[in-house]
């Protein structure tokens, strides 16, 4: 037996049904040692659930029930034991319930027993993922160093790992180690070919996968250590890149998989690999078949660390706020962590375009080599030097994802989120917030001796009120406005008032238990009561508040470590701890939504309703107290967790920022005293000036220190909305800068008039008018500009725009069909520019500029539309454009009429000189 320490990269679980012997459940842990050895740990685990038995049963009756039930449902009788746990559903004074832990050899047996027993008995925790269960039982993190003790060589190897061992799950344990794991990261990309000069389709026999480029880099190292491009057909050398030429396409894919194996790849990354590259590779393997034997020439089973079973197709159809509607196509790589950077950016960043070129330019100041698809096709048909140009292009495409991975700390973001909630990294990629919050609750409930019941939900009718928004006193405030914000309001409310499913009073008999204090709140769903903890002893604290306490402490500690790492110049640890603290924050904020869901693991809508109702009361109380503490002050707005106060100060102190900061801090501190800890009303910023348009819509200069310059802060205006063109945002931003920084409205109006004139005179480049929308799968209404442009691109190039991609477009003038639907005037910006087309200036004035500009100046001018768009010069130019439109329309109608009557235009009888 031996002890080893590994850093896990993948967790797999399965019911194993051997040819001989009994079935069992196994968890396979893949990882790497500090010395760079690959490891596979086989560990058996017996899944279980809890079942509540009647309180009246004697020990003998319970034992008989255990024996009979174990025999009937193939449970492991020696491991099925009586236990006592508290029920995490409804306040009952912390009563211990009689329960039985039924243990099974396989998940299939567990599910069968649960299905048969659930109508007769209350089942607990049958839906807990066994892998997650092990994380909590052994207090280990899914993406952190773990100790594997008492391990012995595996009797039957299932992987190609350097080391393969077996051990009991009880011999897994945590290791306090933040050493950088020597993970090998492989960034890869494919290049494809179409003989017909159309978009390559894997099912077309001659649409080859012509090159696969891969760049290898060790995690934490500054530079890659190997760049290799496997090429179909002879390819000339490329400086700094290893070129491997193959005679057959199948050899390209087999060689690439062997390289991944030889390099002991731990993390596979790419850009759009889940929607294109992996699907294409799979499609080409179906075409690579031996004509004589009919056998596959490419063995996808060589992907990953298993001896067999790699390369299986995994299709996922996901619809979420983060991803939208998307279909993902993966080839399974057991033992290897897969990351598609495109999906990470879609989920975590709000961008105009998610192309690798745009993202790299934005975050790295770097770009791809420009090599259009048609040139790739031509160069593939050329000589070895031509194909080397493709290889250099492909290698560059694999460098950029590695740089983005490091720059954006993407690996740290995924692994630290996985560690914070104790779920595998794969769950972070493909599953929602529910599983994360549930895993956290499972762990905390176990610590506090609670069991989470299956199939519990609060039956509610109607909807509860959302967060409070105080009436907005619209206007332009050229005096300082103090912003008072509650720190982590919803998690703090839950902690302060002990809100949890097992502290919520659900039965009348527990409404007035002697010695128990209650918090009562009226909501849109009714009145709810929560048993409160003893502040001196902590007794009676709920599971959810206790969990949030822990997360708050963990976050505070992570921020402390992050600051230390920053002082020490340790960039790796700084990024690691920053990812940690952000993960804890996300989890804390997700618990409210987890409990408020109508469906899920343990939905408890009353808690969500109680939290928002309490938040409303706190916002209203803050507004009231601010005016009481500083008579003459005015609350001009209040949102979910913040209140804006125009403080009444002596005339000579109104514009004194030091005094404003001093009084705002005092005000926040005084009001905080009215609330139960840990609720904390903070003061962090002054807005000056502050233009309030309506609820959730404002523009201001934000000061976080009294002596700083301040930064523009905008919410809800067209300036920050992606459905407006750059010209709209640019004009609004430039106008706002003049209003906010110079406090000069007349000059802002003059500058805006000049910018509108330039639009009407077509003096701005076309990219300023470009918009983009995400292409989805299937539309009820097909009159969509981006769909129309996507269809045009396909007709012209043969290249379909993939679902999920953002399609750029501009609206152009169409003199031949001026009255067609606006969506049909949408055009591909590149095509429009190359063909000298002119943007539809009337459309941009009427639909992109008129309303946003008038809205911007509404609090500042009596009649913005009249003063700006009714200005003589602007009005005249707009009328001229409208007259041209009418003339074009008249001509177009005459031409259509003549065509319908089979008549020629008189102009057709004359020739141009």
Swiss-Prot record:
The enzyme's E.C. designation: 2.7.7.7
Annotated PROSITE patterns: DNA_POLYMERASE_B (PS00116)
One function term, GO molecular function aspect: DNA binding
Keywords: DNA replication, DNA-binding, DNA-directed DNA polymerase, Early protein, Exonuclease, Hydrolase, Multifunctional enzyme, Nuclease, Nucleotidyltransferase, Transferase, Viral DNA replication
SUPFAM superfamilies: DNA/RNA polymerases, Ribonuclease H-like
InterPro entries, A to Z: DNA-dir_DNA_pol_B, DNA-dir_DNA_pol_B_CS, DNA-dir_DNA_pol_B_exonuc, DNA-dir_DNA_pol_B_multi_dom, DNA/RNA_pol_sf, DNA_pol_B_thumb, DNA_pol_palm_dom_sf, DNA_pol_type-B
Induction of synthesis: Expressed in the early phase of the viral replicative cycle.
Biological function: In addition to polymerase activity, this DNA polymerase potentially exhibits 3' to 5' exonuclease activity.
This protein's name: DNA polymerase
Organism, scientific name: Paramecium bursaria Chlorella virus 1 (PBCV-1)
Gene field: DPO
